């Protein structure tokens, strides 16, 4: 499954770009455990440098006046100017957010929904280049 994502973007001279989109703070135990194992494994599978961009949705949600659109704009502002090679929403809220705003943020980028409860994805049709690892 990860190998399929690894082959999508072809050869590049610049490091690949992978977005880890956390539902909660990165120090949240299950997110941290996943990311700690995932980053080196993905780097090993790609066999080339990867720049990991890590964004937590919780910080944006703590602002009571933040609308979903303002959160989307905040996420967009952290993304690199170059195209992402992989988007990895971690947890249910991040998966729902990524699927909802996929067209505005990363319409053609492969997405690996990680550590997601089935209830967060069962009623949403995945894009052709989406894969979910549900719990």
Describe the function of each predicted region.
Residues 2-135:
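Short hydrophobic alpha-helices and adjacent helix-cap/hinge residues
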């Amino acid at each position: 499954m990860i190998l399929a994502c690894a082959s999508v973007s072809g050869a590049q001279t610049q490091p690949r770009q992978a977005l880890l989109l956390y539902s909660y703070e990165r120090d949240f135990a299950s997110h941290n455990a996943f990311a700690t194992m995932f980053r080196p494994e993905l780097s090993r599978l790609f066999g080339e440098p990867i720049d990991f961009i890590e964004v937590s949705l919780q910080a944006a949600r703590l602002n009571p006046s933040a609308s979903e659109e303002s959160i989307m704009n905040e996420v967009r502002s952290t993304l690199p100017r170059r195209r992402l090679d992989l988007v990895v929403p971690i947890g249910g809220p991040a998966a729902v957010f990524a699927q909802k705003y996929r067209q505005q943020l990363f319409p053609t980028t492969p997405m690996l929904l990680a550590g997601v409860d089935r209830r967060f994805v069962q009623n949403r049709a995945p894009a052709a280049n989406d894969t979910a690892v549900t719990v």
